[in-house]
């Protein structure tokens, strides 16, 4: 059973004994799964609708207490909620980080004997966890702790390592990867082999072979 995600708004202005509860739901996005995926929002639970796949986690509220922002970590998005009407007003995808670009270097292995910060042909999923809102000069800014997370439970797991993927050797520009000349070398533990990845993305043509990491 995969219950629908929702956000409850509890009003205790009249006292805890007279509390009222309203619920913001995501059911209006059911049937829009492909459109949401095209926008970069991850929906990938087995057989799950959008509302079932969304997993609200941390919440922050604007300075004027009219808007809540909720992290949807596994979905790589933030939901904006109008507090007065208890309505989800928009979904904000956070996108991906291309670690092959200058300025996006990272140390991808803990099995290479030291610190080695460099570019690699992988895309990072931001996946926000805790979240905060700040409003200097009347403009609201959202700050997120992009922790990353994978789903791994009985009956379904997206978690794997680069060494376990069937990579398409024609999809990678080895001329641009210093010291790596083949898929086999790329998948060595001192390179990307031990790097944790999701199996739900990267197989762009659904043939079981991964063109992207």
Please describe what each predicted stretch is.
Residues 1-213:
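Beta-sheet-rich non-transmembrane sensory/scaffold domains
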């Amino acid at each position: 059973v995969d219950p629908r995600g929702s956000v409850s708004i509890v009003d205790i202005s009249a006292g805890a004994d007279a509390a009222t509860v309203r619920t913001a739901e995501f059911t209006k996005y059911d049937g829009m799964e492909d459109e949401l995926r095209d926008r970069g929002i991850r929906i990938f639970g087995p057989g799950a609708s959008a509302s079932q796949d969304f997993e609200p986690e941390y919440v922050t509220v604007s300075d004027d207490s009219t808007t809540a922002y909720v992290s949807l970590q596994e979905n790589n998005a933030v939901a904006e909620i109008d507090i007065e009407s208890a309505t989800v007003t928009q979904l904000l995808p956070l996108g991906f980080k291309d670690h092959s670009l200058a300025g996006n270097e990272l140390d991808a292995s803990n099995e290479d004997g030291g610190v080695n910060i460099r570019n690699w042909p992988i895309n990072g999923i931001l996946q926000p966890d805790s979240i905060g809102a700040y409003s200097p000069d009347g403009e609201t800014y959202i700050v997120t702790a992009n922790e990353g997370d994978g789903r791994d439970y009985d009956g379904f797991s997206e978690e794997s390592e680069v060494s376990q993927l069937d990579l398409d050797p024609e999809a990678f520009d080895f001329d641009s990867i210093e010291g790596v000349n083949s898929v086999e070398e790329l998948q060595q533990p001192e390179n990307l082999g031990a790097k944790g990845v999701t199996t739900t993305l990267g197989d762009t043509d659904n043939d079981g072979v991964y063109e992207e990491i």
